[in-house]
């Protein structure tokens, strides 16, 4: 079950907004597409790249920055360079058959991920989430070695170049493993929840909303899946909308839209009536 929030544009001549909280229950014809999120913030060993001697690193927990002290001096000479985060990761044999991702909520400024000594991928930019799929690269039933190399040195092709703030280096937000079934709501669309809400019309009479759901089918077979949306006002279910979808083989990050309408919606007013819908 996934939650995603969004809000509408303003009503004409009004600051009232409709604030929707939706959750989509996604079930394939094979098995339930539940996902597991496993925090990966602890047991990291950190060292700078110039610290090459054995035992030179020290344990840290995420979120972490190597500029926690020097960047507060008010001077522009705080450390900007490469930091390395490493840890072991035991992957149970029972995880075979699932898709496994590692998701970073943020690391500054560029990040390279290595698994068991092999380069998995790079992310450039310090202010957005990113994700890598590890499914076919893990050793199951054994310990795997993760290395995350983060660089906050100035790089002319990575924005911003200047600012009235410090470019704190490190993995400064949470990291987690994500386990899904083969057919799932895709986490690969810029590391988003894979669900986007678009309000196309909102007034006192009705709110027209479209839920765009990004779906993955990495298998070699066409899959028939069902996507369901249920909207609640308080504890009362007011909308149940579902759609049967045929996913072609090897279809990745494919958008499917489920429209629904809320009649006479309870409009959101942040200062006087902060009502929300939920699923």
Predicted features by range, described:
Residues 1-12, 16-21, 25, 31-279:
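Secreted/periplasmic carbohydrate-active enzymes, especially glycoside hydrolases
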């Amino acid at each position: 079950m996934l939650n995603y929030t969004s809000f509408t544009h303003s009503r004409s001549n009004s600051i009232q907004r409709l604030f929707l909280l939706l959750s989509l229950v996604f079930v394939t014809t094979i098995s339930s597409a539940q996902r597991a999120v496993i925090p990966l913030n602890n047991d990291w060993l950190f060292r700078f790249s110039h610290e090459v001697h054995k035992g030179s690193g020290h344990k840290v927990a995420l979120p972490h920055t190597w500029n926690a002290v020097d960047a507060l001096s008010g001077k522009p000479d705080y450390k900007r360079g490469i930091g390395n985060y490493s840890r072991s990761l035991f992957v149970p044999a029972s995880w075979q058959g699932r898709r496994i991702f590692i998701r970073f909520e943020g690391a500054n400024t560029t990040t390279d991920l290595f698994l068991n000594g092999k380069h998995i991928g790079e992310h450039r930019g310090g202010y957005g989430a990113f994700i890598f799929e590890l499914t076919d690269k893990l050793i199951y039933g054994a310990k795997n070695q993760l290395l995350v190399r983060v660089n906050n040195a100035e790089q002319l092709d990575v924005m911003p170049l200047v600012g009235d703030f410090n470019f704190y280096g490190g993995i400064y937000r949470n990291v987690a493993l994500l386990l899904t079934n083969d057919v799932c709501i895709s986490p690969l669309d810029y590391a988003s929840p894979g669900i986007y809400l678009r309000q196309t019309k909102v007034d006192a009479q009705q709110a027209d909303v479209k839920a765009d759901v990004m779906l993955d089918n990495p298998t070699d077979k066409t899959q028939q899946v069902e996507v369901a949306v249920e909207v609640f006002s308080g504890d009362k279910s007011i909308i149940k909308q579902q759609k049967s979808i045929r996913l072609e083989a090897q279809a990745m990050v494919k958008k499917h839209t489920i429209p629904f309408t809320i009649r006479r919606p309870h409009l959101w007013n942040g200062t006087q009536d902060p009502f929300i819908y939920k699923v």
